[in-house]
Swiss-Prot record:
It comes from Pithecia pithecia. Belongs to the cytochrome c oxidase IV family. This is Cytochrome c oxidase subunit 4 isoform 1, mitochondrial. The modification N6-acetyllysine is found at residues 4, 35, 42. The keyword Nuclease does not apply. Keywords: Acetylation, Membrane, Mitochondrion, Mitochondrion inner membrane, Phosphoprotein, Transmembrane, Transmembrane helix. Pathway: Energy metabolism; oxidative phosphorylation. The modification Phosphoserine is found at residues 31, 33. Component of the cytochrome c oxidase (complex IV, CIV), a multisubunit enzyme composed of 14 subunits. The complex is composed of a catalytic core of 3 subunits MT-CO1, MT-CO2 and MT-CO3, encoded in the mitochondrial DNA, and 11 supernumerary subunits COX4I, COX5A, COX5B, COX6A, COX6B, COX6C, COX7A, COX7B, COX7C, COX8 and NDUFA4, which are encoded in the nuclear genome. Component of the cytochrome c oxidase, the last enzyme in the mitochondrial electron transport chain which drives oxidative phosphorylation. The respiratory chain contains 3 multisubunit complexes succinate dehydrogenase (complex II, CII), ubiquinol-cytochrome c oxidoreductase (cytochrome b-c1 complex, complex III, CIII) and cytochrome c oxidase (complex IV, CIV), that cooperate to transfer electrons derived from NADH and succinate to molecular oxygen, creating an electrochemical gradient over the inner membrane that drives transmembrane transport and the ATP synthase. The lineage of its organism: Eukaryota, Metazoa, Chordata, Craniata, Vertebrata. The modification N6-succinyllysine is found at residues 4, 35.
Length: 144
């Protein structure tokens, strides 16, 4: 009885730019036409047509360097998913602003901010290098 090795114990074929010549051929089990072509390969290569040379290349390698270096379209999926999540987040924020959050407090009104700024100036808050240091108390205007 002969022990047969399993496929996972054999070397595997991988197309890689940094390892251009894999240890095994791309096609492991040749068809009858491929076997005939491999026999024809042993003779002079000048007798082979261009299509036969390409077929021999495809038996040995899955992709050429140009095909390996070709860019993928994965970026479209990534950009599409990012735009979907950004749009979903924007819709969620708009719905929260409309239905969850209440109105802004009165302290955000321009009149209230002006009154608070005037009060801080009257109290001379941080007179050394803060808000009060930028106010001219004699002319009642901001320093230039």
């Amino acid at each position: 009885s002969v022990v047969k090795s399993e496929d996972y114990t054999l070397q595997s074929y991988v197309d890689r730019r940094d390892y251009p010549l894999p240890d095994v051929a791309h096609v492991r089990h040749l068809s009858a036409s491929q076997k005939a072509l491999k026999e024809k390969e042993k003779a002079s290569w000048s007798s082979l047509s261009m299509d036969e040379k390409v077929e021999l290349y495809r038996i040995q390698f899955k992709e050429s360097f140009a095909e390996m270096n070709r860019g993928s379209n994965e970026w479209k999926t990534v950009v599409g998913a990012a735009m979907f999540f950004i749009g979903f987040t924007a819709i969620l924020i708009m719905l929260e602003k409309r239905y969850v959050y209440g109105p802004l407090p009165h302290t955000f009104d321009k009149e209230w901010v002006a009154m608070q700024t005037k009060r801080m100036l009257d109290l001379k808050v941080n007179p050394v290098d803060g808000l009060a240091s930028k106010w001219d108390y004699e002319k009642k205007e901001w320093k230039k």
